[in-house]
Regions:
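Lipid interaction determinants
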Residues: 2-153
Length: 153
């Protein structure tokens, strides 16, 4: 018996131009007033891998995250745990693409933020000059995260 994610991947519609390995160029945020800021610091790091069946793995990290003073993951302070969580975003599952309306749908199997597990998240996207960019749905405060990725292969 196939898991629901595996069954979904078999029927997945993937834009062939998305398949490959992408490195993060920018993780910005568009504020309601039209200004733009850095969501994961000045030099965010990340990797997005999408295979030909639509399976994906995505990681975004703030490069400037401080190390835990104790050196022990189980003994961090409240501030250290907050920085670790807020300085990263990771999830995996399958992704499908509506190539007419230019919408990516991430079918999230697991995520660093547990509330996303089992969710489908839609993002408008474009590919131009070897770069993939997409906009995440607005946050409760109106901010719109924007991710920009550059193809590695």
């Amino acid at each position: 018996m196939l898991s629901s994610t595996a069954a979904h991947a078999d029927a997945n519609t993937i834009d062939a131009s998305l398949v490959g390995t992408w490195t993060l160029v920018a993780a910005d945020v568009l504020h309601p007033d039209g200004s733009r800021g850095r969501d994961y610091g000045a030099d965010p790091k990340g990797l997005l891998v999408i295979d030909e069946r639509g399976y994906y793995s995505l990681q975004i990290f703030k490069a400037e995250r401080p190390k835990f003073a104790s050196g022990d993951k189980a003994r961090g302070t409240s501030d250290e745990y907050r920085e670790a969580v807020m300085g990263s975003s990771t999830h995996y599952g399958t992704v499908s693409a509506d190539t007419v309306d230019r919408i990516l749908t991430f079918h999230i199997q697991n995520a660093s933020f547990p509330n996303w597990q089992g969710e489908e998240q839609r993002r408008s996207y474009e590919i131009k000059g070897g770069e993939l960019s997409y906009r995440v749905s607005p946050r409760p405060n109106g901010d719109v995260p924007i991710s920009v990725w550059k193809r590695l292969n």
